[in-house]
Amino acid sequence: MSQWNQVQQLEIKFLEQVDQFYDDNFPMEIRHLLAQWIENQDWEAASNNETMATILLQNLLIQLDEQLGRVSKEKNLLLIHNLKRIRKVLQGKFHGNPMHVAVVISNCLREERRILAAANMPVQGPLEKSLQSSSVSERQRNVEHKVAAIKNSVQMTEQDTKYLEDLQDEFDYRYKTIQTMDQSDKNSAMVNQEVLTLQEMLNSLDFKRKEALSKMTQIIHETDLLMNTMLIEELQDWKRRQQIACIGGPLHNGLDQLQNCFTLLAESLFQLRRQLEKLEEQSTKMTYEGDPIPMQRTHMLERVTFLIYNLFKNSFVVERQPCMPTHPQRPLVLKTLIQFTVKLRLLIKLPELNYQVKVKASIDKNVSTLSNRRFVLCGTNVKAMSIEESSNGSLSVEFRHLQPKEMKSSAGGKGNEGCHMVTEELHSITFETQICLYGLTIDLETSSLPVVMISNVSQLPNAWASIIWYNVSTNDSQNLVFFNNPPPATLSQLLEVMSWQFSSYVGRGLNSDQLHMLAEKLTVQSSYSDGHLTWAKFCKEHLPGKSFTFWTWLEAILDLIKKHILPLWIDGYVMGFVSKEKERLLLKDKMPGTFLLRFSESHLGGITFTWVDHSESGEVRFHSVEPYNKGRLSALPFADILRDYKVIMAENIPENPLKYLYPDIPKDKAFGKHYSSQPCEVSRPTERGDKGYVPSVFIPISTIRSDSTEPHSPSDLLPMSPSVYAVLRENLSPTTIETAMKSPYSAE
């Protein structure tokens, strides 16, 4: 079943999550119409290869054209219109940046896999629960309702201001008319009546001025209250969701809704400011004793201006945190002299600002003594913001060609001698701009989440561990001295994040049994719901009896899955995290030949399989093959190893002991679609292949002594050519072959 078909069968709460990350960048109509084709392309690789991305974009447009041709025959006018519009938008938006469409589609597919994994989890973790609180959704609806109410109130005061202007014009006309009369006419009854009318009009004007100012004061109060409570809380929640998304959590959303709220409030405040200026003009033309406008207007204008400044300062955000295109799942880790991308957004989208706002990027602008290392940003570090071409286009700017460069220290060498490891040093990228609008000049500044600077890719795993720990442990976006005294993390939160590493990086998260095994590896307690873990135990202290840390072990497994067993992992056929004790408990009552796949606890980046059989006396026996590492898996795909694996035992003919994947799935049914070649057959030495050579293949073979329940060591896997093996079988007895394989030279 395709991934998209699985998505469509999700419950409504998960479908709502899917709906949130499909927009004009990658419309859901395209995902639906081209589901299978999209899933068959390597978008992640294309996100780092411009040539490949260009080809995929062209092929995507060709696929769209084919769909257009099909629906044209069906005369589906609405779908034809939508497809033409989508094609035009895609071609215009990504023509100059094809790698971006690859990033967008890759992120969408990865997020689908994360949601599918979450749907299969029995419970959500504490972090994800906190992000999906019903009270948060209720607050968002309240914010939108209050913003709309403020906008409506400002429209009403606009009418009041216009009415005051009309009333004052009429009063002014009547008053001047009386003033131009002859002295003899001013004593007439009609004039006296007109004077009374003017007095009533003046009283009404005074009342309406006070009423309008009172309404405006109330609007200012409500706006102030909204901005400093619910709206700021919404923004802080979005920033927290962004933090969590950076370390593999649910894709953050809601920025478009915030943009609508910020923009409407800004429009309302500027409109209110113009109304106050209009009232000042009216008061200048006509004032009187007790006129409320001169007494209140200045203070009110100051409050409105302050709110505008405050709104703009909060509206300048980092929409997409710094990330190297070569490592899209490892944001906030930057390598010297390697380009990274970062995107800024102004949540107040006013047409007057299009191409008028220039943003400057710098690094460690406000930092003086936190690190001996100093950096500068090379490349284009000043760019203008523009409104994107989409239905809800944002006013944004993306820096794509920035490179961090380390400066030499004053001592003449590179400064790495601080109190922290390089991967524990936190740095900040700052962005500055200035808004000039309607007579106001507003200086804005915002910063990225803390980043870790590395000079060698080998530092990436530990740097990523620092990013994980920081963003799990704190909401503070600028605590650059965090690792002076890193706080412990709750084990339940940390395990949830570990599952996110697998769902975001290799397409499938961890289930409760797998997480339980990790908890036992991290702590001796059997229940991990309320435990805590220190930074040192997670990333710096070696595991008991091992020469590596927990994080190094886990990162090596992620790398192994990504490069060598990804399809098997995504299909759920790798149990992976299971202890030897639990492994035997699971297998002991199963049919002979039942096996499972688990990650080695003693070898970095190793995977092994264990199968069960019975001795002649009926005794249950377990056999675990020496773990396969990336070196061995580079020579032979793991699925092919499972298919071709042979065991030589006593006088028996070599046979494959692997029959059923736990619990009872026939091996070929589970792995058949992943086999990369035909089964290996042993050729006779006299058989000739192309150009007269004897065909040769690698066969994974283990020897097991008849009196042992464990595979032989040091070499339980011996690749040999079929011709050599055939010669051995013809000229030597099985006992002699076994003796030879026990030789210390056989492992060389």
From Swiss-Prot:
Residues modified as Phosphotyrosine: 693
Entries under Gene3D superfamilies matching the protein: EF-hand, SH2 domain, STAT transcription factor, all-alpha domain, STAT transcription factor, DNA-binding domain, STAT transcription factor, N-terminal domain
Gene Ontology biological-process annotations: cell surface receptor signaling pathway via JAK-STAT; cytokine-mediated signaling pathway; defense response; interleukin-12-mediated signaling pathway; positive regulation of transcription by RNA polymerase II; regulation of cell population proliferation; regulation of transcription by RNA polymerase II; response to interleukin-6
Upper taxonomic lineage: Eukaryota, Metazoa, Chordata, Craniata, Vertebrata
Disease: Systemic lupus erythematosus 11: A chronic, relapsing, inflammatory, and often febrile multisystemic disorder of connective tissue, characterized principally by involvement of the skin, joints, kidneys and serosal membranes. It is of unknown etiology, but is thought to represent a failure of the regulatory mechanisms of the autoimmune system. The disease is marked by a wide range of system dysfunctions, an elevated erythrocyte sedimentation rate, and the formation of LE cells in the blood or bone marrow.
Record's keyword annotation contains Acetylation: yes
Phosphoserine PTM positions: 721
GO terms under cellular component: chromatin; cytoplasm; cytosol; nuclear body; nucleoplasm; nucleus; RNA polymerase II transcription regulator complex
Localization, UniProt: Cytoplasm; Nucleus
Family: Belongs to the transcription factor STAT family.
GO molecular function: DNA-binding transcription factor activity; DNA-binding transcription factor activity, RNA polymerase II-specific; identical protein binding; RNA polymerase II cis-regulatory region sequence-specific DNA binding
Subunit architecture: Forms a homodimer or a heterodimer with a related family member. Interacts with ARL2BP. The SH2 domain interacts, in vitro, with IL12RB2 via a short cytoplasmic domain. Interacts with STAT1. Interacts with JUN; this complex efficiently interacts with the AP-1-related sequence of the IFN-gamma.
Known role: Transcriptional regulator mainly expressed in hematopoietic cells that plays a critical role in cellular growth, differentiation and immune response. Plays a key role in the differentiation of T-helper 1 cells and the production of interferon-gamma. Also participates in multiple neutrophil functions including chemotaxis and production of the neutrophil extracellular traps. After IL12 binding to its receptor IL12RB2, STAT4 interacts with the intracellular domain of IL12RB2 and becomes tyrosine phosphorylated.
Modified residues (N6-acetyllysine): 667
Highest rank taxon of the organism: Eukaryota
UniProt effect for mutating residue 112 to Q: In a breast cancer sample; somatic mutation
Keyword Repeat: no
PTM remark: Acetylation at Lys-667 is required for JAK2-mediated phosphorylation and activation of STAT4.
Effect ascribed to mutating residue 650 to D: In DPMC; likely pathogenic; increased function in receptor signaling pathway via JAK-STAT
Record keywords: Acetylation, Activator, Cytoplasm, Disease variant, DNA-binding, Nucleus, Phosphoprotein, SH2 domain, Systemic lupus erythematosus, Transcription, Transcription regulation
Species assigned in the record: Homo sapiens (Human)
Name of this chain's protein: Signal transducer and activator of transcription 4
Domain called SH2: residue spans: 569-664
Main localization, broad class: cytoplasm
InterPro entries the UniProt entry points to: p53-like_TF_DNA-bd_sf, SH2, SH2_dom_sf, STAT, STAT4_CCD, STAT4_DBD, STAT4_SH2, STAT_linker
